[in-house]
């Protein structure tokens, strides 16, 4: 059965050899449609001794047979995926000849060890992979031809592992749809291919930059990663639909690491808090401005109210000074009452009632007896009717001058006596500082008219 199918496939490229010579990249697209590609690549997975021992895999050639038996079923699925995948960039379908040489080298090495009969058959499969296109691919070549011209420069700079790794997610989807068991083998294959890519990264660091850029674009399109093994068909188709919209809005949403998400959310929270705090700070400022405006409008509208406010503020600041003007009379009255009590004003008021006359400030003077007071008042002319103090009514009379108390009168009397004694001593001791001594028993009399000076008359 296998040989017959390959004979049919080999008959097609003889008719369409001219198109293959002109456009080599489209022929590489046939690798996706033929399930022989899986047969060619599978020995790579089988060669690793650690994985074959760990997972209990069978020898290499039985795996090739199993995959060939399932060729028809998988090829139909591949043909269904051909039409949607034509829109993707042509670099997705590239496969460099250097990688093919490695695959053929593995096939020859493995076939030489076990069976020499299988080696020409494997080579025929490889030749079929190179030259066997489906009839649909001839139509797709014309569509993809224009895109290939644009992406020629990217194809030249493309690396072998990149093209191989680009195709891996699509193969995962095709085999997952057919059989869940095959997905594990494809995942192992992808890991081995990634290991080969890491080895070639060290050799060519310049080509690594182009690889990183292509990987970013592929992840933007939403293809399934090799680590995810069991998605359904609906889940496979949904990332492709979303991939067309995602690059427009967000450049690389899948590339964001999980560790950076809390930091980014924290930054967003901090920004939102700052935005929330700014209006809170601005509101008191607006209130202050409004208050200032209200005060200015109040000054312009009601100047009298503002003046009263200033008066109240002055009173609060300077209580003593402002109270002095209002409480002056009260203090004077209190002082007058105290002085009157000490000086005996009560007795004077009684005599005043008895006499029926007002003597002004002399009423406040303190006397030992009433007779002494009356005698003093008569000598001062207090009882004369012509006195202006009597004629004036009590309301019109100003504040009476307070008479001295006993203590003040005694101090005043002592001061006057001292001054008198000093003057008399000066009169007696005139010229004493010049060496003359005064006669102790001599008495002098004060007389203005008598003088010892000589008057010269012209």
Swiss-Prot record:
Cystine connections: none
Signal peptide per UniProt: none
Annotated Basic residues bias: 64-73, 145-155, 198-218, 265-274
Residues with Phosphoserine modification: 42, 50, 111, 132, 265
Ranges of compositional bias, category Basic and acidic residues: 1-14, 173-192, 336-353
Chain ranges passing through the membrane: none
Subunit structure: Interacts with ZNF106.
Protein name as annotated: Lysine-rich nucleolar protein 1
Species assigned in the record: Homo sapiens (Human)
